[in-house]
Amino acid sequence: YMSGPYCSMLLADAGAEVIKVERPGSGDPRRSIPPFVQKGDIKKAGGFMAYNSNKKSLSLNIRSNSGQKIFLDLVKIADVVVENLRPGSVNKLGLGYETLKEINPKLIYAAISGFGRLEGYEGPDSQRPAFDIVAEAMSGIMHLVGFEDKPPSWTIYGMADIYSGMCTAYGIMQALFMRERTGKGQFVDSAM
């Protein structure tokens, strides 16, 4: 669940206005994971801050009618939507690419998942959820790190999340450039 935040952080660092939509109450799970950085009375999770610099946050229940209305109002004026939720979850809410492109035909919609899900190119695992460690294990990278006499090892820093986030940000920039030439938005599909 870090590839989307990393991707959008890269866009924010490049000057984009990024609004991160978070679940009401708990927000992003990384908000509560140590280590914490404290300045005066304010205590923040270092990992959350590392992946969310230069962003605005909006607490929004996209499962409610009022939350969906606010979200769709934002989509009308957005250049890009980035999501890295379980495949199909936004479609169940009626907020997938097919719906959003009707509202904003110039929208660049980027979806990051474990195995990719571009229509016509789905593999047998396209609907399966995946975390960074799954992508690292299935790609073989875990076998290349660590020690010869030990079992495969996780790269710790989220290599698959970071790499897929970086590639997605690059894909979004290409899509924005293409939109300047054609006036059309598009779907950017990224697999970890």
Go through the PLM ranges and name each one.
Residues 190-192:
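Mixed-charge, glycine-rich, non-catalytic linkers/tails in nucleic-acid processing enzymes
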Residues 1-181, 187:
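N-terminal helix-loop segment corresponding to the beta1-alpha1 unit
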